[in-house]
Each structure stands twice: as structure tokens, then as C-alpha cells.
């Protein structure tokens, strides 16, 4: 006991109480003589002298460290002191849901304002770039909010995004503008067939410039509109330029687009251009434009909606994946075989489009505005000639030969194509 009291490391524990025979006694009073012989006790310290605080971070486990500090917001005061405050409960819940956004059952009926914040939080965490989980999460939003997620999609020259994120692109609904120029789709591409689905019946502007399309692709794209009266029935603008495999026969499939106001068929494989102009004017009222139309300069078609930044993330991921390929020789050999240029950081231009625009004039068509009611009336002779022409056309339509022609207008390939829907 004496050794303990005389120890230099002794720290005063304070008063000590002992209960004896039902009475409480202070032991320190009995040790007054001993205390007097000792040196003055040192003041009680919570930490020894020289104690310092050091902020240590375990860099090996960033996730665990993030979970510990994610509940606080660190700010600096005017004096330069670090101050932290707790996040709101809404922010904590929003962060937790965005980390597990792919496990949400449904967002139908959820407020749009909260859903937009949830979408932005998941986008900041790059949840939509994850394979599998990103697609499931994106489908939940597109099913509930449609055009709010994306109303306009521009994939011009982004053939890598189309190849890598095809299912994600197909999940978008209620698009009004879609630009797939210079994506090398071809007639048998899955995305071309997806254009005829009911989910994209809202598309009014479609750009398919330089996509290796032919008459077969145009026939497939217009089959639902021609027979079932569904699909791209609301289309008002169509760009089919720089597809040299489209001939005069393929243009005939476009007559089913009754709402079409602008059409670009420059650089196609037309032989009788004058006959095509007359047919377009007669069937759907489109007139050849002598000057380039501003609707086809691609300045108005942009990616708009909540997911506009996600498309950029997809592009960065796709380009990075191509750069990280360890064995580029097979790809270079394939590019040499197909006479394609090597990938560069800059977006790919359409050399085919430039050659066609330089070699021949543009074939762009537009719908003339209806004449104003204040314009002078037509003469009686012009009225009679129009009436006579209309009666002759009615007689031709009512004849049995014309009825037979209507029945035979669909080929066997068309019926096979329609049966596949």
C-alpha cells in the first residue's frame, strides 16, 4: 500500500467511500496523515501530457470510411475552423435508396419532384453505368415517368453507345426526337425493328442518315403503319439521306406516312428523280425544296431529359473500354478489311455524306402551307378540271381492276413480316 502511494505514477482517484455496518465512511479521512507526508497530488487529467489528436483514414476500406462520414457535412467557418453538421433525414434516406436503386419494385405514383432528385443522386453515383443493375434501375424510371426521363435522344456518330447499351436505349419511352445518323445500323439491326413498337409511336422526328439502309429496311420499318395503322404513324420529319441502297421502289413505302412534313432523300440510289418528285407531291403533298432546309442541319436535335448526362457517361465508358483492349491487332485488321477508319478521340464524320452532297444536289422535300382564305378564288375552268380529274380517279378506284390491285399490294414477305409482330 505504501509503495503504491509513494509511486510517481500515482493519480489522485478522488474521495473513496466504504459502507461498514450500514454506515458510509470516507476512507480519505483516515489517510490524512499519509496524505500530509506525500507530495501535493497532481491534478486529475483525462489525457496525459503531450496527447495529440490525429485524423487517420483507412484507405484500404474506403466504403466503410464513407459510411462513417457520409452522415455529416463538413464546412469551414469564417475563422477557418472546420465545422461539421449532421445531414437531414431526407438526404440520408435519398442516399440509401440511390445506392440500392436497382432493387426498387416500382415508382409508379411516386411524386415527380422526389423522383428527379432520386434520379440525380443515382446518376451522381454512376449507378446507371453498372451492367445489369443499371438497366433494371433505368427501366423503373422509364416505366413511371416516360418522356420526363428522356424526350429527345441524339446518338449521332455514337455507334459504340448503340452497340454497348442497346437494351438501355430500347428502354426509353415516349421519345419525340431520335437521331441515329451515322450509326451503321443496317436492315437487320434490332434497333430498327424496335422503332415500329408502340413504345416509340410518339416519335415525330427521325434521323437515319448514313445507316446502310436499303429498300428491305424501309419496307420493314413501314409495314406496321401500312397495314396495322400503328408504329411511326405520327412521324413528321424523316432523314434517309446517304443511304445509296434505297431506290425508287423504297420511296413508295414512305407514302404511308400521311403526317410527314419534311423528307430528306439526298444521296440515295434514285434513278428517275423527276418521277419520284411527282409521286411525293401526288401522294403525300411534299414539294421539292430548292434551298437546304434548316430542319435537317441537326442543330435542333439534342439529348433532353433527366438522363442527358447518362448518355455522356455511356459514351465515356464505351470509349474507355475500346482503349483498354490489350490486343488491338484483330480490330485493325477488321477495319482494314471493311475499309473503315481507325477509331480516334474525335467523333467520326460521315465521309459518304460529304461525297454525296458534293456530287449531287440535295433532295429535300417539305409540305406547302395551306392557302389563306383571303386569297382570290380559283377560276371556274380550274374548278371544273379538278372536279373532272377527281371523278376519273373515283371511277378508277371503284373499278374491279383497281380493287384487285389493292388486294395484291401486299407481298408474301410483308405478311411474313407482319406475322412476326
Swiss-Prot record:
**What keywords does the record list, in alphabetical order?**
Leucine-rich repeat, Phosphoprotein, Repeat
Q: Which InterPro entries match?
A: Leu-rich_rpt, LRR_dom_sf, LRRC42
Record bears the keyword Repeat:
yes
Q: Which Pfam families match?
A: LRR_6 (PF13516)
Q: Which residues carry this modification: Phosphoserine?
A: 399
Tell me if Transport is a UniProt keyword of this record: no
**Ranges occupied by LRR repeats:** 149-170, 174-195, 202-222, 234-255, 259-280
Q: Where is this region: Disordered?
A: 374-406
The text of the family note is: Belongs to the LRRC42 family.
PANTHER family, per the entry = LEUCINE-RICH REPEAT-CONTAINING PROTEIN 42 (PTHR31994:SF3)
Q: What is this protein called?
A: Leucine-rich repeat-containing protein 42
Amino acid at each position: 500500500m505504501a509503495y503504491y502511494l509513494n509511486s510517481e505514477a500515482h493519480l489522485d482517484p478522488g474521495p473513496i467511500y466504504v459502507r461498514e455496518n450500514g454506515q458510509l465512511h470516507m476512507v480519505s479521512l483516515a489517510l490524512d496523515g499519509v496524505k500530509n507526508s506525500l507530495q501535493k497530488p497532481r491534478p486529475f487529467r483525462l489525457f496525459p501530457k503531450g496527447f495529440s489528436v490525429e485524423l487517420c483514414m483507412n484507405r484500404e476500406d474506403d466504403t466503410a470510411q464513407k459510411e462513417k462520414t457520409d452522415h455529416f457535412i463538413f464546412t469551414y467557418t469564417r475563422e477557418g475552423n472546420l465545422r461539421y453538421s449532421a445531414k437531414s433525414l431526407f438526404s440520408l434516406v435519398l442516399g440509401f435508396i440511390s445506392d440500392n436503386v436497382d432493387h426498387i419494385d416500382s415508382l409508379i405514383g411516386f411524386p415527380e419532384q422526389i423522383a428527379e432528385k432520386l434520379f440525380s443522386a443515382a446518376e451522381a453515383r454512376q449507378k446507371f453505368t453498372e451492367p445489369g443493375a443499371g438497366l433494371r434501375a433505368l427501366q423503373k424510371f422509364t416505366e413511371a415517368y416516360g418522356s420526363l426521363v428522356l424526350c429527345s435522344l441524339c446518338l449521332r456518330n455514337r455507334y459504340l453507345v448503340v452497340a454497348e447499351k442497346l437494351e438501355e436505349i430500347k428502354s426509353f419511352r415516349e421519345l419525340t426526337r431520335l437521331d441515329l445518323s451515322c450509326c451503321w445500323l443496317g436492315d437487320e439491326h434490332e434497333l430498327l425493328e424496335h422503332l415500329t413498337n408502340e413504345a416509340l409511336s410518339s416519335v415525330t422526328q427521325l434521323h437515319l442518315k448514313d445507316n446502310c439502309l436499303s429498300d428491305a429496311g424501309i419496307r420493314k420499318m413501314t409495314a406496321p403503319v401500312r397495314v396495322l395503322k400503328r408504329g411511326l404513324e405520327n412521324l413528321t420529319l424523316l432523314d434517309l439521306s446517304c443511304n445509296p441502297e434505297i431506290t425508287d421502289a423504297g420511296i413508295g413505302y414512305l407514302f404511308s406516312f400521311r403526317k410527314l412534313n419534311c423528307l430528306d432523300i439526298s444521296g440515295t440510289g434514285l434513278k428517275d428523280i423527276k418521277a419520284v418528285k411527282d409521286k411525293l407531291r401526288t401522294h403525300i403533298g411534299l414539294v421539292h425544296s430548292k434551298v437546304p432546309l434548316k430542319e435537317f442541319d441537326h442543330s435542333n436535335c439534342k439529348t433532353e431529359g433527366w438522363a442527358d448526362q447518362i448518355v455522356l457517361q455511356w459514351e465515356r465508358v464505351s470509349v474507355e473500354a475500346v482503349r483498354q483492349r490489350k490486343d488491338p491487332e484483330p480490330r485493325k485488321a477488321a477495319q482494314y478489311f471493311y475499309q473503315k477508319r481507325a477509331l480516334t478521340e474525335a467523333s467520326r464524320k460521315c465521309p459518304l455524306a460529304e461525297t454525296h452532297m458534293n456530287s449531287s444536289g440535295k433532295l429535300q422535300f417539305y409540305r406547302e402551307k395551306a392557302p389563306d382564305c383571303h386569297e382570290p378564288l380559283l377560276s371556274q375552268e380550274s374548278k371544273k378540271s379538278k372536279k373532272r380529274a377527281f371523278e376519273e380517279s373515283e371511277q378508277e378506284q371503284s373499278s374491279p381492276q383497281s380493287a384487285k390491285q389493292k388486294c395484291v399490294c401486299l407481298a408474301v414477305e410483308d405478311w411474313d413480316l407482319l406475322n412476326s409482330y
